[in-house]
Amino acid sequence: MIFFSCKKDDTNITNIPLEDLSQQYTLENDSIIQFMKSHFFNYDDFNDLSPNDSPEIVFDSIIGDNIDKTPIYEQVSTLQISVKDADDNLVNHNLYYHIIREGIGENPTVADSVFVSYKGLLLDGVSFDTRKNPIWMEAKNLIRGFQEFLPLLSKGDIRVNNNGTYEFFNFGIGFAIFPSGLGYFQSGSISIPPYSPLIFKVNMMTLNRTDHDNDSVLTIIEDLNGDHDFNNDDTDSDNIPNFLDDDDDGDGVLTMNEYDLNKDGIPDDTDGDGIPDYLDLD
């Protein structure tokens, strides 16, 4: 069964009480750490991988015959991400991740389009979302934890066969575990209970850089404040975010005709005031 549960707007309409973000994070982080200390993944299956091989990542309890397995807790790295609470205070959240195979190509940004296969799990092992065959997804439209994990993986190589089929090699493989503050928090979704930490297992096949308004400025560059929210950057205050606005500064000159006319890779700044022409009214 396939669910579609990793998009930001795939939420449950049921009203759930809003918990304090900081307190909820502490509770969930403790649960995640407990899970990681008591579980391992099948790391032996990933030794000496062939370039196009991708065994399924499987989690299991460290008990019985598995008592000597290395816990996930000893293998993960941590990415700290700030999340705003209801009062606009920032609360740091830990995203735990492990890269099994990094990949050999470019890394996506949080704004790019990615071609991935993945599986989403709750801490109890129940799968809520799976794509065995890769699909294209817009990273900026995904829940924060999934979105922030993707740039840690690199794309692989692609080979197109004579019959029109294609194969991927040396693509990135990894998993991430994160609290609900980076997921659905109180809203949950059809298949995810409110306040649920999530696990995503991901294969990063390939990517496309995005320029959503075709103004010659990559969407990631349109995130002027670097907060990975592309809707709150609106230089000319016309209620059209820069990544969808073909005239970012509202001066009547299209951004593509102001951005980098000499093609040196540096945004033009004709008056030398430190503000690029495409964002400068004067």
Regions found by a protein language model. Name each.
Residues I2-S5:
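C-terminal motif of bacterial Sec signal peptides marking the signal peptidase cleavage site
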Residues K7-D282:
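Cross-family detector of peptidyl-prolyl cis-trans isomerase
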